[in-house]
Amino acid sequence: MNGDWISGGRENLRVLIDYKGSGFPGGQMQDDLLLFSLRPDASPNPLALAVVNFPPIRGKRSLYIHRLSGEAPEDRDVLLDAIEAFARRQGYPVLYLNVMEQEMSYLYSRGFTVSPDCPIAAREVRR
């Protein structure tokens, strides 16, 4: 399915970002999760979804795309662009992505390098 069929044009698409953070009472808040969704206006059904969290990777707090899904590659690309813009503003130098549900050709064509020892791909954030 793509946005043209639902909304009459891709110009009516929006990237929605839902934030979840947590903290102990009186303590500092921490970022737990961002959910990015690409939706046509007035549609409850997303065309693409991405779940982002912030685990330590290689000793540093990192931006990790736990899930990136959507039928059309161009819809996933819209979310990748939004996530990369967020990463750039927040100072994350690398995007990490779980490769378990991804086509390798998609990852390589988007500039990701796949780790040989774990199911993670990485790409430097473009400045």
Where are these regions (language model features)?
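Structural motif
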Residues: 68-69, 98-101
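STAS-like cytosolic regulatory interaction modules
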Residues: 117-127
